[in-house]
């Protein structure tokens, strides 16, 4: 994201009794009165792996954006070598880390509720935040979300492990993460941990009250369309967008179509 309005910065939060530095970046409109959208990255993502999509979206909407790297990702505090994530790791990001970040940056979610835009694991975290804090969001855009574990997902994550071990994927991730092993193995190990096979947030998301746009590609290698259709069954105000010629990353595969859909969605929700 070298063309961003501001370089990445850092803020310290207290997470479970320990200090954690989070990498973050402001993009888009300078005015505090502009609507705010917070970007939550995928399971191997970071601030820089969004590339220019946050800037493009905020420019189209006239909004300001907050992009951040979760603990263990990007240049945020890495995962300790012996640290293993639990089955509730996405819940903890939604219920603990994201609220702490917003508070540290003095974002008043009661006075001016933000929007969330999440991708993959970040989309699941956004759904969990919206379910826990239903009065503190203006709306939600989720790209390739997970609401339960599918066999397709696990097969692709198993393949990702082989790719990481036997190709130059580690070096490629090293361009975006200070510690690529922290990012990769934290994500890969928990998803392939046998108890995680039963992970589901299908019941929890019924508490969501804000408008929701759920987006998925027809060629998503990490989930079937039942993921977003399952959201629509449980959150009736959900608008679905199923994109052809699109894999797991709609913002990379179909950015123009996605931005147009978000513009229409946010205009209708205003």
Regions found by a protein language model. Name each.
Residues 187-204:
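Active-site nucleophile elbow and catalytic-triad environment of alpha/beta-hydrolase enzymes
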Residues 67-114:
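Active-site loop/oxyanion-hole signature of alpha/beta-hydrolase fold enzymes
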Residues 219-223:
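Acidic catalytic loop of the alpha/beta-hydrolase fold
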Residues 208, 214-216:
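Short beta-strand/loop motif that positions the catalytic acidic residue
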Residues 239, 244-270:
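Catalytic active-site module of serine/aspartate enzymes centered on a nucleophile-bearing elbow/loop
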Residues 27-80:
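Conserved HGGG/HGGXW glycine-rich cap/lid loop of the alpha/beta-hydrolase fold
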Residues 112-150:
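Conserved hydrolase catalytic core segment
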Residues 17-28:
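A short loop-to-beta-strand scaffold at the N-terminal edge of the catalytic core in hydrolase folds
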